[in-house]
């Protein structure tokens, strides 16, 4: 038990450092999913150098959970990034960051002799709401295209259960609407491997690649293989149109659309197929039941099988085929059809709204009845009703199999899987084992549900000690305030007469819609300095343009406190009170006051004309 470690292990452990994830040239290193996103562009640049190309990279975006610490990780790794020609330039907001990355690909038609590198690739990052607001940029840039040694990866941080968001998010459908193929890693190693494929596919097919990440993956840690040549990229045979698929100028809009619809997506599919990005992980000679899963849901499905007592050998014995989908849109058809052949039924396991399930149903719809497997996912069939569709009955709850809201767990998946498998003719030993395991699962669930927490132990989140929000979110008696995105959102559950909120950058503008129809004459709106810098100044401009009577409390603490305390504006001096006051005067605000517990700080400071300082 206390025997000394072998010498080779002791030597290996003695040389381990926290910087291994960035400094090692080969081997394995311990890292988180976020740190893998830092190492990823280094690996891409190293592979390019191995191919004889001198490339650079731009990383830009806007912080937000579960990618809230990505910018800090990039800053910490600055010395390593610089050695790989990688520039990190945070965006004022998500869409401007995406536009900057579009600019890296426009170097494809820059004047001859002006470029320092053979190509510049890019990584965009943002939270789910940031994906929403970037759709215009994504569509334009994706249709315009990429360069042969450029390429762009857009990384979305999705909060499926609204753990730190005002709404649950699923970026798959936004990426799809913008025409970006969607990668969904299930592990730290996947972040590296699929990230390499995503940029390679972006270069080959002339599209931007999307990558969906969630907390359970990017905030997990693991030992990953960091060899630059680990991933063997296969460029498929594909008949390119005249002029190829890359960015060019001039390029009429309808030509771009036709190139995307008729060639780019199919080039991406050829890449997915050639590199087996979607593949069977469990299969046998007599398979009859199929399971398709992606991302976190794939991990949960494997755990659900274990919880039911179905190891790999038992799955092969029963004829259960498991298919891992790493690119959820577009769903590669040939691989999908091969997976579906010979199966009687397929269960699609994916969190949130259907994206794989609908594509699978479309792909197999015209198969002859004897060959076409039944497909279930979010819903199964009712007794006497074979539809199994989402809109088949007035109340879908009656035949819901795997919920689309919130998230999925191994327990939910195990119950759904057991419900379907128990319809099969299972061997008696397997049947007995599954029923025993289900009893254990049910017992655990009952035990958890029986736990009653003492309400007195509840503790709602509150402002940090010393934070100016403790006092600045209070309003005079008889007044009310509107909330928005930021730490000050917490005032909605405090006794501060704060009701309602908006999306980031919309703070206060609901009053424009209300004031014409209300006897109220005035409201307050809270807005943090981080949101103000991001997009909130436009909400203030809208209120001034509309001429409404509103007081904006620009809550200044010189930090984006919710995501790590980063400086506002990404500059050493941050975004100062003086700058904000001058901007508000220029926008036409009638009364501007600085309220502070240290008024002496502004003695002799050249604030905008008419700005008063109050204690």
Residue ranges and their predicted role:
Residues 1-40, 44, 185-451, 456-463, ...:
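Flexible, low-complexity linker and terminal segments
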Residues 454-475, 493:
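Cysteine-cluster motifs in flexible loop/terminal segments that predominantly coordinate metals
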Residues 588-615:
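C-terminal catalytic or substrate-handling cores of phosphate/nucleotide-
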Residues 50-98, 114-116, 284-331, 367-378, ...:
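Anionic-ligand anchoring segments at beta-strand to alpha-helix junctions in alpha/beta enzyme folds, i.e.
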Residues 59-61, 154-156, 348-350, 551-556, ...:
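Short internal beta-strands
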